């Protein structure tokens, strides 16, 4: 069964007053309703099926409040124009008096009729005296029941009280029992007042007709309906909402909001519209088409309205004027904003930094942005200053289109002056945060988000920084030059050329005796280092077997195992050999002094464990690393490692003969620290004693373990290798760009140390606002920037994206802003947008069901 839809509830817009205290415009409305109550019940059969048209009420007293659904306000179909014009003709006073008499005769007989007869006689005499003058000239305060004309509002109020509010209500309702009960007292106005409060739309209320809204500009536009006088002036009213207008075009346009005939939906986003032209304009934003071009400059737009607004910048035309003052503007929205802020409009938005208040949300955002990010981008042509680079670009393109050679000087710009609490943290806090990030990365597996392919030289620089953090306990913040070099493509090649030049100069200074001596030591050092790492990895794995945490320590062994392999692959290159030759001479003295203390400790561990098991552990660890590298063949870096590892796998025989030479191993660790940076050799000579002091504590605790437990450890580790290889991701992907400084540093520090340029983008002036810049002059920037103080609204204090995926998500979130096609409000969240849209379309399905049921 279809549910009939009736007009808006009776008494919605009636004020909370006693019946005897109704204001003069309301009484005029009630008196006029008596005159127009001639409609039969047949005229209301199709009332709930579509939009109706409100019949004109004389003397500019337009009403949005209706009594019961009969004999209140007559409606006619929009299509019946001829019938409407006949009904809107002038009404003769004689039938009015007859109707009033007929209605009053039908009242209950318990009331005295003497007063009514006297009142009717008085009305007839007044009608005969004023009939001719009323036809020629009518004053605003005109009483239709008795044809009384008041000079001002006060006289009219005094006169209208003579009729009595109760009599007017009885005349409206006839003999119905409900209206008779309404005559009993003022309690009947309370339910209407409650319904008015519950159904009210806003806080601003029209005193004449009860129209209410929460927007001051809508209220000012509504008052224009009352200023246009005349009986032939029609008022069109929406039966679903409180919309009223005097324009039939706008009334039909509003009707389409409730009854969309066809919806055009965008396949790329959630936009939809019932207007094909709006849909075509929206599709152009996705395709990048800008067919509307300016004839005076290079400006182009996807919408004709934007081009029309742009042309006013060339002509200087300001056609929109404020109704209350002499303010002129090029756009209507500027006049609306001016009326809100200047002419008694509510200002609910207040700035938290100063006493600024406004009603415009866009201006509020721009004002707060000036506190956080002041205007530092200055126009070189005029005195305009912008808070963002994209706004200055749009300003130059729109205001100075002829100046093509303008270059923006952003060298002195310092953006993001007021940062959040996380950005203002001290270096020690940054170190703690980075340590947490590194632990999370180790647990979750390696993630490489960088687009560029890191070279070996960049890896050496990163290991130098990580070694300093591990030895000193403090994070050395990179200089701005290092930040810029990490964000560009060329610095890696430049550093390689510089290092080659330095090594070439230093090679000429070295003698042939040093070259031959170092080359002989190098072959022995590699074998000793690989054997020593295998021994330490076995000793580290014995503890997790006892503590039931084998998997975590196996990851640490993975990182320590790949370190000598990276050193071997790196030393095989001729460039690395030339560089290491020059650095050994500088670190020679330091290495000899530092290798005396750990010699005894290392010899003890070698005696306890034995040479045969060292060879077995070395083979096991190499097989495990080979399996894990074979798991991910997609990375080209890991393929290179695999091939180089196979070449070096045939050297375990030399490691057996040279295991008892700890001095060579310690000098190799000092070379690894010094070979990473040639210029910092002095600093490296001071740091190794701190790093080398760690083996004094750890190896004695592990060396007490008996030899008989080694086969049991091997039996436990072999099934664990299959589990780790399938469950854990490949760790060498992270370590490919970072080499560990020494064999013992892996115990005290995490294996993966991301540098600061990976966590925060450099605050370069050219790249700071690349997300917000619109080189093509987008439509959003057009509509927001023209005639306003600043066009960037939504990007006030956003942080720069830290990763490429975050940047992609941020750009996608901006594209998904939803704009209501009915009231042009924008919503960032789709959920809020859907809720708002349901308010417009809440009665569509009910009305369609009613229309189908009526057929």
Curated annotation (Swiss-Prot):
Compositionally biased intervals (Basic and acidic residues): 462-472, 481-496, 504-535, 570-580, 628-638, 711-721, 799-811
One Pfam family in the UniProt entry: zf-C2H2_REST
Zinc fingers (C2H2-type), renumbered ranges: 141-163, 204-226, 236-258, 264-286, 292-314, 320-343, 349-371, 377-400, 818-840
GO BP annotations, alphabetical order: branchiomotor neuron axon guidance; facial nerve morphogenesis; facial nucleus development; locomotory behavior; motor neuron migration; negative regulation of DNA-templated transcription; negative regulation of gene expression; negative regulation of neuron maturation
Parts of the chain that traverse the membrane: none
Principal subcellular localisation of the protein: nucleus
UniProt keyword terms in alphabetical order: Cytoplasm, Metal-binding, Nucleus, Repeat, Repressor, Transcription, Transcription regulation, Zinc, Zinc-finger
UniProt-annotated stretches for the region Disordered: 172-199, 458-811
An example Gene Ontology CC term for this record: cytoplasm
Subcellular location: Nucleus; Cytoplasm
Biased composition (Basic residues): 594-604, 639-648
Molecular function as annotated in GO: zinc ion binding
Gene3D superfamilies for this protein: Classic Zinc Finger
Positions with biased composition (Polar residues): 186-199, 548-569, 652-662
PANTHER family: RE1-SILENCING TRANSCRIPTION FACTOR, ZINC FINGER PROTEIN
Function: Transcriptional repressor which binds neuron-restrictive silencer element (NRSE) and represses neuronal gene transcription in non-neuronal cells.
Record remark: domains: The C2H2-type zinc finger 5 is required for nuclear localization.
Name the record gives this protein: RE1-silencing transcription factor
Species in which this protein is naturally found: Danio rerio
Name of the encoding gene: rest
């Amino acid at each position: 069964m279809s549910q009939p839809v009736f007009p808006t509830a009776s008494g919605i817009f009636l004020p909370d007053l006693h019946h005897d205290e109704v204001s003069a415009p309301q009484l005029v409305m009630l008196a006029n309703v008596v005159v127009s109550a001639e409609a039969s019940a047949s005229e209301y059969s199709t009332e709930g099926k579509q939009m109706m048209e409100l019949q004109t009420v004389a003397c500019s007293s337009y009403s949005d409040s209706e009594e019961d659904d009969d004999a209140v306000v007559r409606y006619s179909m929009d299509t019946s124009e001829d019938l409407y014009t006949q009904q809107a003709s002038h009404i003769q006073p004689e039938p009015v008096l007859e109707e009033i008499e007929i209605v009053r005769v039908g009242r209950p007989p318990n009331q005295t009729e003497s007063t009514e007869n006297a009142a009717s006689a008085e009305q007839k005499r007044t009608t005969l005296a004023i009939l001719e003058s009323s036809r020629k000239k009518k004053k605003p305060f005109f009483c239709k029941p008795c044809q009384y004309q008041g000079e001002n509002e006060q006289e009219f109020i005094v006169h209208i009280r003579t009729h009595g509010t109760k009599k007017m209500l009885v005349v409206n309702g006839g003999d119905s029992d409900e209206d008779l009960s309404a005559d009993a007292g003022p309690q009947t106005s309370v339910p209407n007042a409650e319904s008015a409060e519950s159904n009210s739309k806003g806080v601003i209320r029209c005193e004449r007709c009860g129209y209410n809204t929460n927007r001051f500009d809508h209220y000012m536009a509504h008052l224009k309906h009352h200023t246009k006088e005349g009986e032939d002036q029609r008022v069109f009213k929406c039966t679903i909402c409180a919309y009223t207008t005097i324009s039939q075009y706008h009334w039909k346009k509003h009707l389409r909001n409730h009854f969309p005939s066809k919806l055009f939906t965008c396949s790329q986003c959630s936009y939809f519209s019932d207007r094909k032209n709006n849909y075509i304009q929206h599709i152009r934003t996705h395709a990048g088409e800008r067919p509307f071009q300016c004839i005076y400059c290079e400006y182009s737009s996807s919408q004709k309205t934007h081009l029309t607004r742009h042309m006013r910048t060339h002509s200087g035309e300001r056609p929109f004027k404020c109704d209350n003052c002499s303010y002129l503007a090029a756009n209507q929205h500027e006049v609306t904003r001016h009326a809100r802020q200047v002419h008694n409009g509510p200002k609910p938005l207040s700035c938290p930094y100063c006493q600024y208040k406004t009603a415009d949300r866009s201006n509020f955002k721009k004002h707060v942005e000036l506190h956080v990010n002041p205007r530092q981008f200055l126009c070189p042509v005029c005195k305009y200053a912008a808070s963002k680079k994209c706004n200055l670009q749009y300003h130059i393109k729109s205001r100075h289109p002829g100046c093509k050679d303008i270059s923006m000087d952003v060298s002195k710009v310092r953006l993001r002056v007021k940062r959040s609490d996380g950005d203002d943290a001290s270096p020690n806090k940054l170190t703690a945060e980075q340590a947490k990030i590194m632990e999370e990365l180790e647990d979750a597996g390696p993630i490489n988000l960088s687009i560029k392919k890191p070279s070996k030289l960049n890896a050496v620089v990163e290991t130098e920084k990580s070694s300093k953090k591990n030895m000193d306990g403090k994070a050395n913040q990179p200089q701005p030059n290092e930040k810029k070099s990490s964000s560009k493509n060329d610095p890696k090649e430049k550093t390689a050329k510089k290092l080659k030049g330095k090594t070439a100069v230093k090679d000429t200074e070295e003698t042939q005796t040093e070259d031959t001596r170092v080359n002989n030591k190098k072959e022995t050092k590699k074998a000793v280092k690989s054997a020593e790492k295998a021994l330490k990895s076995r000793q580290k794995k014995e503890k997790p077997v006892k503590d039931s945490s084998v998997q975590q320590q196996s990851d640490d062994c993975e990182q320590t195992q790949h370190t000598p392999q990276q050193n071997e692959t790196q030393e095989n290159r001729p460039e690395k050999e030339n560089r290491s030759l020059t650095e050994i001479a500088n670190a020679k003295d330091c290495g000899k002094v530092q290798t005396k203390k750990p010699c005894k400790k290392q010899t003890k561990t070698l005696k306890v464990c034995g040479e045969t098991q060292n060879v077995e552990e070395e083979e096991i660890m190499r097989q495990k690393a080979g399996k894990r590298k074979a798991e991910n063949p997609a990375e080209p870096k890991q393929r290179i490692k695999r091939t180089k590892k196979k070449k070096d796998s045939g050297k375990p025989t030399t490691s057996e003969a040279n295991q008892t030479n700890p001095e060579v191993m310690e000098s190799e660790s000092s070379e690894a620290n010094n070979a990473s940076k040639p210029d910092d050799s002095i600093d490296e000579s001071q740091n190794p004693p701190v790093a080398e002091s760690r083996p004094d504590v750890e190896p004695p605790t592990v060396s007490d373990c008996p030899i008989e437990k080694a086969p049991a450890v091997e039996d436990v580790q072999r099934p664990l290798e299959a589990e780790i290889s399938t469950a854990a991701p490949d760790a060498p992907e992270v370590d490919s760009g970072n080499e560990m400084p020494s064999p013992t540093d892996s115990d005290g520090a995490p294996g993966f140390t991301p540098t600061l340029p990976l966590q925060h983008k450099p605050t370069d002036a050219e790249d700071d606002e690349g997300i917000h810049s619109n080189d093509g002059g987008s439509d959003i920037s057009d509509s927001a920037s023209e005639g306003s103080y600043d066009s960037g609204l939504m990007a006030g204090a956003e942080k720069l994206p830290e990763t490429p995926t975050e940047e992609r998500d941020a750009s996608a979130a901006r594209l998904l802003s939803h704009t209501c096609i009915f009231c042009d409000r924008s919503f960032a969240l789709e959920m809020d947008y859907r809720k708002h849209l349901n308010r417009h379309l809440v009665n569509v399905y009910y009305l369609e069901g009613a229309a189908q049921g009526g057929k």
